Design a protein with these regions (language model features):
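Charged, compositionally biased boundary regions
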Residues: 1-142
Length: 142
């Protein structure tokens, strides 16, 4: 596993790109999506500014490797969460279903799709935010 300071640095580089997207930030965000811990930490930052976060997540998705369905599914599910957070349930529904098509065995996309289907998008955003903020706090407490 990477040393904690390297994880923190990847997160900080990615988070800095949410409002000022750059190649470096997109690259760091892609690295964040390779580990659940960093993905969740970055989710907290994306949800801090959901509108900019949604645009940034779409940048990252376009840059993501098409040959890595697990990562693509996670990114697509993230877009669904951010779409809910910005009051776009239509986009959220499309993204949630696409995520489960891309990665049918991935837990996060599956949860996002289930909660979207039963009309619990807002509740899901709260749950994701709570978990993500806890993960971010722990990452920086070490």
């Amino acid at each position: 596993a990477l040393p904690i300071y390297m994880l923190q640095r990847e997160y900080e580089q990615a988070a800095a790109g949410i409002t000022q997207p750059s190649t470096r930030a997109v690259r760091a965000a892609l690295k964040c999506f390779t580990t659940k811990r960093l993905r969740d930490t970055l989710l907290a930052a994306l949800l801090d500014e959901p509108q900019a976060g949604l645009q940034f997540a779409e940048h990252v998705m376009r840059a993501g490797p098409t040959s890595w369905p697990g990562m693509r599914a996670q990114l697509t599910a993230t877009v669904a969460v951010l779409a809910h957070a910005t009051g776009q349930p239509g986009l959220a529904g499309v993204a949630a279903h696409r995520a489960t098509e891309i990665g049918p065995d991935e837990n996060f996309p599956s949860l996002v799709a289930k909660l979207t289907d039963i009309g619990q998008g807002e509740r899901m955003v709260e749950l994701v935010r709570e978990g993500a903020e806890k993960t971010r706090t722990i990452l920086f407490a070490e």
